[in-house]
Amino acid sequence: TYGEISNALESFDNKRAAGVSSNKNSEYLIRLKDNIQSVQKVSEIPIKVVNDSEIIQLQDIASISRKPLSPVEDIFMYNGKVVVSVAALGAMSPRVHDYVDRARLVVDDMRSSLPEEISIEEIYDESFYTSKKFDELIKSFSLAIFFVLSISLFFLGIRPAIIVTLILPFSVCLVMIGCRAIGLPLHQTSITGIIIALGLLIDNGIIVVEDYKHRRNIGLSIKDSINESVRHLIIPLTAATATTVFAFLPIVTGEGPSIEFVGGLAMTVIMSITSSLVLAILLVPVLMSYMEKIPYFKNIDIYSEGYHNKKILDQYRSFLTWSFAVPRRALLISISLPVLGFLLFTTLPKDFFPAQDRDMFRINIELPSNASAEKTLERARIIRNQVLESGLVEVEKDYWFVGRRMPRVLMNIVGGKEKQGSNNVAQSVFFAKDYYQMIDNLPELSKLIVDKNPDILVIVDSFIAGPPVFSDVSYVIFGDDPFVLKQLGEKLELIINDAPDISLTKSETSNINTNIELDLKNSNISLSGINPKNLVNELYAANNGVIVGTMLDSNKEIPIRLKGINKPDDILGSASYLTIPSQNGFEYIDSFGESRITNKSSIITRQDGQRMNSVEGWVWTGTLSSATEDYIKDDVEKFKNELPPGYSIKQLGEAETRGESQASLYSSAVIYMILIVIGLVLALNSFRQAGIILSVAILSIGLSFLGLFIGQQNYGFIGTIAAVGLIGLSINDSIIVLSHIKEEAEKKLISKAELVEVVIRSTRHIITTSLTTLGGFAPLIFASVFFRPLAWAMSIGVLGATMTALLYIPAMFIYLKKIKY
């Protein structure tokens, strides 16, 4: 029997201690010399002694050879060739460039010692994409400095322009110090936060510069101008900054995969705007005073700096007078864009996160569950050739992982270094030569590949940013009866499949495994005198094989596997005619019962002890799952109401991940909203004025929706972040205008004409901050698909925020009856 052979082999493997011989002076370890060091030694192992003199060796009854593990469990294919893959992961602490450089030195050293027929190629390098992201940061930073300097020079003059521009590098340096202090690495999301903050950093500086210029113009000394500016602005600027900080804090303190993904972004934004406040209050007034002492600037009238045009000023004064004569006019003009944004929100496509801006796309395939790794590899080759022959995407290189998950080339890829997967599954990454060609033609390519492979599950898609999402549309049905769960799953699968843009669907319980089932009769086994346990062990050894020892080969320990020889073309026959020794010689296993091929569900999943059936759907590349969810919403609700007693349904997929992330964000946002209200009331010393500022926050959300609509962008998590950023910007401008109006109103009861002059005084720095912010965000529209929703929302929204500050705030102040009519 296989059991007897196994015992014989194990008994001759003497790689173990044989005891210790000791006396009062010393101890000696007793060990046997290793007797299995080659295939020949394994072949000569005695198995049985016959007639007290004849020895049956293993080579007499078995074929012994040294070969790779069969069947193969996982295969790696690179550019159509089966090769060996090595993945190296660095720790979080070292810089990726330094780590990659050190790894390359090791590889180069090894490459020089390899024979000619063996080569080493680098197929993926994370530092390349990190460098691109830093290049974007440097480019955005350079453009931001250019726009800030140019716009500030035009509107404010040379001295304010130099000072305001200096805030950018100083603030970024403070952020770098902060990241180092809290241990936040510079990666995609944290760098994104710095890029977002570039449009917000100089607002406080411009406001302080303009206020200082105003104080000097009315005759105050340098010292008094500094004191008055700081005294007047420290509370409103701190309140505005605190409002922005509280708006971003839910992203830092929330829970869930999305919050975890963008938490670094919120941290760098908070550090950026906080540093800009500190620099604006402490550094800007001092630099302005020093600038006045420089001989080159002494003859320049500080208030005359910047662009002046009396004709435009008179027309603007007339417009403000007309608007505030009937405050409803100013209100209607200022709220028209936000209201339009809210009305257009229902037309915005909804996604979770935008696509990755990398020249990579993926193809995942799943064959029937009984498919071997070799069969999956064969199908992977066919699909690879279909991609190359289509000519739709020019491929630079590609790699496939068959029978296991791919390594974590992106943070949202599940599997990583763990060897998880099945023989019937393959995952691949294709690197395109042209990113834009890839994005344009990927939808057509996905339909082509799916149409050519209707018998298997194929997913062709680009990589998305954000946390991992396993399927676009997903539901889980809970219940007790597997048969009922299967029927319900098939019914729900039809509902999902009927929706537009669905490329394929999958019900977990419909995943059928083909098995060889042996129906053994207990009576036959008992009459034969065979131990049932030995029978099962014989079956296992004959098919899967058992490890019976190891062979030392130099410094390697190779396992010895005992396995039966099966005919690959007759699996059922090999199982039926397996021989089992008995009292009367031997018996075929078919003598103890019947063998037949069966098809049964291969998966039984439970959650909290309850059976469940997962039903998933995938949409075509280039389409959004939100449209599919909206289409099937009523049918799914009807399906839910018709479920049998004891059965329930839960939505998963992208919708669940998106919902969990937004729920976590909004739940923690309530706490910070209360803190924002408290801070505004304390800063403004008025509930009504705090209410006006809060209404500005609501209007700014509508402006962000309008920006997304104009830019033809989807509303997702990045759009939500854009709305939060725009809230901070709008409140900042509005609080400053309101503080200027309050400053004049506290001296006396002002008239509408005087109100117009206060607004004109605030206009220069409001327009300057808006244009510099626009200049900071506009380049991002062309920089990356990841930033586009943010860039469009902020770029268009900031223009509406200007009208809100200059028209809405004064009009509401008039309604508070704080002026003379």
Each predicted region: which residue ranges?
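Extracytoplasmic/periplasmic membrane-proximal domains and adjacent transmembrane bundles
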Residues: T1-F146, V209, K486, E493-Y672, ...
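Solvent-exposed, membrane-proximal periplasmic/extracellular interface segments of envelope transport
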Residues: T1-N14, R31-Q37, K375-P468, S523-A541
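Hydrophobic alpha-helical transmembrane segments in multi-pass membrane proteins
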Residues: K15, K139-S152, L156, V172, ...
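Helix-loop junctions and hydrophobic alpha-helical segments within the transmembrane domains
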Residues: I123, T130, F134, V209, ...
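Hydrophobic transmembrane alpha-helices and their membrane-interface caps
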Residues: F146, S150-K213, I678-I750, L755-R761, ...
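Transmembrane alpha-helices and their membrane-interface boundaries in multi-pass membrane transporters
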Residues: L198-E210, L233-T253, E260-Y303, S428, ...
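Signature of alpha-helical transmembrane segments and their immediate interfacial
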Residues: L233, I302-P354, W400, Y475, ...
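Transmembrane helices with small-residue packing motifs
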Residues: I251-E260, I335-A371, I413, V460, ...
